[in-house]
Amino acid sequence: MKYQQFVNSFTHPLQHEDHTPLLRLLSVHGKAAKGIADTVGAIDEKRLKNPGHTLPDLWDEIAVRHCACVYALYKTKDYTEAFNQQDKLLSLFYRWFVDQSSWVLPVLYMMLSDLRDLAEQADQTIHAETGKMPSLEICTRTVSKAFSLCATDRQFKGEESRRRGVYHTACLTIKCYFKVGKPNLCKNIIRAVVSDPKTPSVDTAPLPDQVTWHFYIGMLAFLNGEDKKADEELSWALKHCPADAKRNQELILTYLIPLRLLHGRFPSASLLSQHPRLELVFTPFINAIKNGDVEEYDRRLEWAQVRLVGMSVWLVVERAREGCLRSLFKKAWMASDKSTRVPIETFRLALKLHGVDVESDEVECMVANMIYRGYLKGYISHEKKMVVLGKTNPFPKMSTIAR
């Protein structure tokens, strides 16, 4: 595509508020972008100041910045320069965007996605050498600005309001915060969304944005130890996640499976088989809980520690070890003819048989903790070194235990 032809292509969609052609014209991917890089050539500052054509205000420079971006991306392979040009393009776009209605939101989403991709490409070498991500830091601020422009729209109402873009831009901002290691800032975005009565209900957002929003709310609740809320939000996200979105399902299950382990609720083998990476990590823990195999559980905790920490689920999986202890103690109780009085020594020997050799006092502490948490019904006779269990259902189902 020749330069003048490219420039003229903006006139009709801008006049008729048609976002579809703009998606093709302003994408940094695809044949159109590569064609511009091939035919337009380098963009110098002289052309930026005197583009030689007339488009609606600001669009002269927006068009030229896009040419500069794709030239750097495809011709000089200067990813930092490509990112910088895309970031400058968005700064110009925002100045025009504040006077527009929701018709242009798809274009905003695409340009923000492209900006994030370019930031990651620009930071690859720097991050490997220094651990820093300067372009992604800038990207995060630019994306956050887009959220603010959507959330503060007072010019348009209803379907035309830019507030329709709140959830998409909020989720993208949260994703960027996690990328740059600042998840603590996510609460500011969430508070801005939920505290503003003018924010549309999440139910009115496109389903993909709803799923992403519920996922992030659930993940943040998970990280904050709010198990019930996390389970509800992640379960909703999984239920409504498209069947063919396997990667997104895997992200949701990464947090949902550990939560379910706490309640003795296990994913089916067929579900796990669809996600081999999760199957490899979690199947041994599931089997260990079912069998009361504390030694195997501890071995797997050590084996998977680095991966579990990287997934941010280590602490919850470690807590789920209590379910494994419960299964073992229940087996010991059943081997004692389901007596309501079980010596501490019986539980100690059960642990020893599974490779956990501890003193009676420590076993007593374990039992006391399990009684406190609701895994056992009964009390400890310290003088007689005896656990006195309830006559009915001394080992409640894990799914009924309040967490």
UniProtKB/Swiss-Prot annotation:
The protein, known as: Protein CSN12 homolog
Gene source species: Cryptococcus neoformans var. neoformans serotype D (strain JEC21 / ATCC MYA-565)
Domain of life: Eukaryota
One GO CC annotation: transcription export complex 2
Residue ranges of domain PCI in the record: 211-394
GO annotation terms (biological process): poly(A)+ mRNA export from nucleus; post-transcriptional tethering of RNA polymerase II gene DNA at nuclear periphery; transcription elongation by RNA polymerase II
InterPro entries: Csn12-like (IPR045114), PCI_dom (IPR000717), WH-like_DNA-bd_sf (IPR036388)
Family named by the database record: Belongs to the CSN12 family.
GO molecular function, one term: double-stranded DNA binding
Segment forming the signal sequence: none
Any Pfam family hit: PCI
